[in-house]
UniProtKB/Swiss-Prot annotation:
Protein's pathway: Purine metabolism; IMP biosynthesis via de novo pathway; 5-amino-1-(5-phospho-D-ribosyl)imidazole-4-carboxamide from 5-amino-1-(5-phospho-D-ribosyl)imidazole-4-carboxylate: step 1/2
Keyword Lipid metabolism assigned: no
Class of enzymatic activity (EC top level): ligase
UniProt GO BP: 'de novo' IMP biosynthetic process
Pfam families recorded: SAICAR_synt (PF01259)
Catalytic activity: 5-amino-1-(5-phospho-D-ribosyl)imidazole-4-carboxylate + L-aspartate + ATP = (2S)-2-[5-amino-1-(5-phospho-beta-D-ribosyl)imidazole-4-carboxamido]succinate + ADP + phosphate + 2 H(+)
Molecular function GO terms recorded: ATP binding; phosphoribosylaminoimidazolesuccinocarboxamide synthase activity
Annotated protein name in UniProt: Phosphoribosylaminoimidazole-succinocarboxamide synthase
Enzyme Commission (EC) number: 6.3.2.6
Annotated InterPro entries: SAICAR_synt/ADE2_N (IPR028923), SAICAR_synthase_Vibrio-typ (IPR014106)
Keywords: ATP-binding, Ligase, Nucleotide-binding, Purine biosynthesis
CDD domains: SAICAR_synt_Sc
Cellular component GO terms, alphabetical: cytoplasm
Length: 367
């Protein structure tokens, strides 16, 4: 079996029983289970959810996305070996740590396979909850152009690139395109202030005003938990994106939870600590791949300018990246995952067949 066979690239064609369209995202695919299968699993497995709660199978792929495009490698290597397993292992570790420390639950009910979660359907809060401890990336680019206010927060003059900020900044952006909210542009991923969210509590899908305080608290506490844990491995937690949503427990009580993924190289920037102390930035996240793309293509504006999306999609479609680049990403993801979980990561030899076998034999979900 060659390297490409060990990579799960297409994850929306599994024979999982569903009566709804499969939702296929950039990296994950979601299979909504039938009412009968959801109810059966809740009863048989003892999940702490209402008896009629909708459940889904979430399958992560090894695809690599950046700048809103999915990128492919040469020699048929159209994903990054071990990437999906690494992302899920990291999220599983942090979600468990959050729960153990009394922060909040996640949407994950069961983990049948390293690439698979069984999740409870959540009502998502419509913000990307971003926390920044250092000024870098898009924030630094805006700062160099003279911007000093970010999401309603004014930051001081005289900051330098990659400098630690005076305090952890919460700089949320919209999740999807929100319409009819005064003062909020109708575009995906636009920055919003705390006052914007307070003016449109329901528009951002919060149940009540007090939950804005709660999400900020959970974001800060979650950031600190991950930052402290990574520091033990001499890694710097630079910035991250969390997502939140609402679910009901078995007693019918609504609760705000963490969802999607947390503290991964896809959703966060992580720097090597010793290199940072020497004034060098060694990326331990997808940011290294983003920087490689910016340096690789002569007209990097295509990757940064949202008015050139058609050109960007064509760039990703028509260029096969060197296998060495895909393997460098693999080494980064697997390496940081093994630091986080404290053990060797087991990479599937034949992931698609393994998933089908487990979901058939242990969950009776294969048609």
């Amino acid at each position: 079996m060659n390297l490409a066979d060990k990579v799960l690239v297409v994850n929306d064609n599994l024979p999982i029983r569903t009566n709804k369209p499969v939702h296929s995202g950039k990296v994950r695919s979601v299979y909504w289970l039938t009412e009968e299968d959801s109810a059966r699993l809740i009863k048989d497995k003892g999940y702490d959810v209402p008896a009629d709660a909708p459940l889904a199978i979430m399958v992560i792929s090894d695809r690599i996305s950046a700048f809103d495009c999915v990128w492919q490698g040469e020699n048929g290597l159209n994903g990054v070996p071990g990437k999906g397993t690494a992302l899920n292992a990291i999220s599983n570790h942090w979600f468990k740590l959050f729960k153990d420390k009394g922060l909040a639950d996640s949407h994950i009910l069961d983990i049948p396979h390293p690439l698979v979660w069984i999740v409870q359907k959540a009502r998502p809060v419509m913000i990307e909850a971003i926390a920044r401890q250092y000024i870098t990336g898009s924030m630094w680019r805006s700062y160099t152009k003279g911007e000093r206010e970010f999401c309603g927060i004014t930051i001081p003059e005289g900051l330098e690139k990659d400098q630690k900020l005076p305090e952890l900044l919460i700089t949320p952006s919209t999740k999807g395109v929100l319409t009819g909210l005064e003062g909020v542009p109708e575009a995906d991923d636009v920055n919003v202030s705390r006052s914007d969210i307070e003016r449109h509590v329901e528009g951002f899908n919060f149940t009540k005003l007090a939950d804005i305080d709660l999400y900020e608290k959970l974001l800060k506490e979650g950031f600190d938990v991950i930052s402290d844990a990574l520091a033990e491995h001499d890694q710097v937690f630079v910035d991250t994106k969390f997502e939140f949503g609402y679910v009901n427990d078995a007693a019918g009580n609504e609760k705000l939870i963490y969802m999607d993924e947390v503290g991964t190289p896809d959703s966060s920037r992580i720097w090597d600590g010793s290199s940072h102390r020497d004034g060098k930035i060694i990326e331990q996240s997808k940011e290294g791949f983003r920087q490689w793309l910016l340096n690789h293509f002569p007209d990097s504006d295509i990757l940064l300018n949202k008015n050139r999306m058609e050109e960007r999609f064509a760039l990703a479609r028509d260029n096969k990246l060197p296998e060495s680049v895909m393997m460098d990403i693999s080494n980064t993801y697997v390496g940081i995952a093994e630091k986080v979980i404290g053990s060797k990561l087991k990479i599937s030899e034949n992931p698609k067949q393994e998933i089908i076998d487990i979901l058939r034999e242990e969950y009776q979900l294969i048609v």
